[in-house]
From Swiss-Prot:
Entry's family note: Belongs to the universal ribosomal protein uL14 family.
Annotated InterPro entries: Ribosomal_uL14, Ribosomal_uL14_bac-type, Ribosomal_uL14_CS, Ribosomal_uL14_sf
SUPFAM superfamilies: Ribosomal protein L14 (SSF50193)
Primary role: Binds to 23S rRNA. Forms part of two intersubunit bridges in the 70S ribosome.
Protein name per Swiss-Prot or TrEMBL: Large ribosomal subunit protein uL14
One cellular component (GO) term of this entry: cytosolic large ribosomal subunit
NCBIfam families for this protein: rplN_bact
Pfam families (UniProt xref): Ribosomal_L14
Subunit composition and interactions: Part of the 50S ribosomal subunit. Forms a cluster with proteins L3 and L19. In the 70S ribosome, L14 and L19 interact and together make contacts with the 16S rRNA in bridges B5 and B8.
A molecular function (GO) term: structural constituent of ribosome
UniProt GO BP: translation
Organism from which the protein derives: Chlorobium chlorochromatii (strain CaD3)
Keywords: Ribonucleoprotein, Ribosomal protein, RNA-binding, rRNA-binding
C-alpha cells in the first residue's frame, strides 16, 4: 500500500538508493499503489556517479510491498520492505541489475525485463 509521501528503497543499480513517492498512476482519485503499479518518485539519496541523481523525478514500478497482496489461488504475498525499480520513458528498467526477490505479479503486468533480471521471483 504505497501512497504519496511513502519512502521507498530502490531495488536496482540505477544509482538511487532511497526515493519518495510523489504520485500514484491510475486516475485522479487513486490513493494507493500495490505490486506492479507505476508511481512517480523523487530521488532522496543517490550514489555518486550513478545514472540518476538526487532530486531527479522518475517513473518507477513497485516490486515489493509490506502490505500483503491476495493472489487468485487464495494465498497472500508480503515482503519486509517497500521497494521499486526505476523506469525510463519506455517503461524499461534504467539499471542493469535487480537486487532481491520480486513478486510474480510483475509477469502478469508485462514487466518481463524486470522478471528476467531478478534473482528470484516469488
Amino acid at each position: 500500500m504505497i501512497q504519496k509521501e511513502t519512502n521507498l528503497v530502490v531495488a536496482d543499480n540505477s544509482g538511487a538508493k532511497k526515493v519518495r513517492c510523489i504520485h500514484v498512476f491510475g486516475g485522479t482519485g487513486r490513493r494507493y499503489a500495490s505490486l506492479g503499479d507505476q508511481v512517480i518518485v523523487s530521488v532522496k539519496t543517490a550514489v555518486p556517479g550513478g545514472i540518476v541523481k538526487k532530486k531527479d523525478v522518475c517513473k518507477a514500478v513497485v516490486v515489493r510491498a509490506v502490505k500483503e497482496s491476495r493472489r487468485k489461488d487464495g494465498s497472500y504475498i508480503r515482503f519486509d520492505e517497500n521497494a521499486v525499480v526505476i523506469l525510463n520513458a519506455q517503461g524499461e528498467p534504467r539499471g542493469t541489475r535487480i537486487f532481491g526477490p520480486v513478486a510474480r505479479e510483475l509477469r502478469d503486468k508485462r514487466y518481463m525485463k524486470i522478471v528476467s533480471l531478478a534473482p528470484e521471483v516469488l
